Amino acid sequence: MAQHESATRRTPAQLRASVVGVLASLVRWAGLVVVLILVIRVLLTIGGANPANGITSFFRSWSDPLAWGFKDLFTPSDAKLRVLVNYGIAALFWLIVSSVLTRIIRRIG
């Protein structure tokens, strides 16, 4: 029995590697969820989805805070182009940030 317990015990380095791996994965997935929300907002807007629809308003309400200062970075007269450019840049920003943070976490760990 004692041999079995010592064989399944993890070293501190193994435990740290597991925690770092999970944390890096969480950061990466969170970034991808944010990007997905922003991209869906762009697709719904470009596609001319009904703004009063529940799905459209859900993604609008979630994407506005995630776009930060990007939502009015460029102000073309066409509303669809404005959403495409500004929310597209915000999606790229979050994709890059989550990727960089994931690499930093893995490198530190």
Residues covered by each model-derived region:
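Hydrophobic alpha-helical segments of integral membrane proteins
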Residues: 26, 55-73, 77
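N-terminal intrinsically disordered, cationic/polar leader segments
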Residues: 2, 6-18, 24
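Alpha-helical membrane-inserting segments
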Residues: 39-43, 70-71, 97, 101, ...
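Individual transmembrane alpha-helix segments
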Residues: 76-91
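Helix-rich interaction surfaces within compact, conserved domain-sized segments
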Residues: 84, 92, 97, 101-109
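Membrane-interface elements of multi-pass transporters and channels
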Residues: 46-51, 77, 104-108
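Membrane-helix exit/juxtamembrane interface segments
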Residues: 41-62
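N-terminal signal-anchor transmembrane alpha helix
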Residues: 27-48
